[in-house]
Amino acid sequence: MKAGSLIGVTDSTEAMQKLSHVWMPLGKRVIIIGGGLVGLELAEFLIARGRQVCVLESGTHLGRELSIVRRWRVLHGVAEHGGQMLTGITVTAIEGNRVRYQTADGQSADVRGDSVVLASGAMPDTRLGDALSSAGLNVTSIGDCQSLGYIEGAIAAGHRAGREA
């Protein structure tokens, strides 16, 4: 049994948030591969805890999954606190504390950090739903197995599916 669970610390979200300002298992310079919802919110979280971040995004735009107002606020906050954000990047290697990449115009470059986090997105796994549908069962996909998004959308879709069943 871990010490945190013995004293109830890990049961308290508030306690965990406070502790994350004191200690985290990440270095001071963090490279985040992926500039979508997860990558940008992680960058924002880490900056609030005194980390330097560099976000590498393969696409041309950052935070496409975020609402416009939220995206603007996160991008502004990351930039305002010295976060580096690069788009059109193809990561070619992760070697120790260095991430090598190629820019959209073919230039090779690298960035160094103490920690690397992969936040390059997720793809829904539809195999179970597809197999059940193929077996003749009525399947309604909701949440991230339908499309990536916020929990509110998944809850609303589940409510609709329940009413229509």
Describe the predicted segments one by one.
Residues 1-66, 102-115, 119-165:
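Rossmann-like dinucleotide/flavin-binding elements
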Residues 64-92:
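N-terminal Rossmann-like dinucleotide/flavin-binding domain of flavoprotein oxidoreductases
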